[in-house]
Curated annotation (Swiss-Prot):
InterPro entries: Histone-fold, Histone_H2A/H2B/H3, Histone_H2B, HISTONE_H2B_site. Residues 9-31 have a biased composition (Basic residues). The lineage of its organism: Eukaryota, Metazoa, Spiralia, Lophotrochozoa, Annelida. SMART domains: H2B (SM00427). The keyword Ubl conjugation applies. This is Histone H2B. Belongs to the histone H2B family.
């Protein structure tokens, strides 16, 4: 008869006890930053009864990161052209106008202006 194999829970408990005895530090888990919770909140505002798969969330997260990097790079370039060392909301606004097409840029600028106004009024 083969020997009994310990369950996963028992193995984890045994390894924790071993680590505690030998004075080893527990390996700290690295936090993964993403926009997932914010994407989910917006999805629920727009379509409350709709869900999103993890693969679709990963794609959306990549999209937000890509757009963020493009806007930051363009704003940095604009600040450099104008011999400025600070990226202000004006550079961000101009970068958005340059990167996004037509109506999308108008909506993005109006939403951005609204967000900045809300932030400054709450201070």
């Amino acid at each position: 008869m083969p020997p009994k194999v310990a369950s996963k829970g028992a193995k984890k408990a045994a390894s924790k006890a071993k680590a505690a005895r030998s004075g080893e530090k527990k390996k700290k888990r690295r936090r993964r930053e993403s926009y997932s919770i914010y994407i989910y909140k917006v999805l629920k505002q727009v379509h409350p009864d709709t869900g999103i798969s993890s693969k679709a969330m990963s794609i959306m997260n990549s999209f937000v990161n890509d757009i963020f990097e493009r806007i930051a790079a363009e704003a940095s370039r604009l600040a450099h052209y104008n011999k400025r060392s600070t990226i202000t909301s004006r550079e961000i606004q101009t970068a958005v106008r340059l990167l996004l097409p037509g109506e999308l840029a108008k909506h993005a600028v109006s939403e951005g202006t609204k967000a900045v106004t809300k932030y400054t009024s709450s201070k």
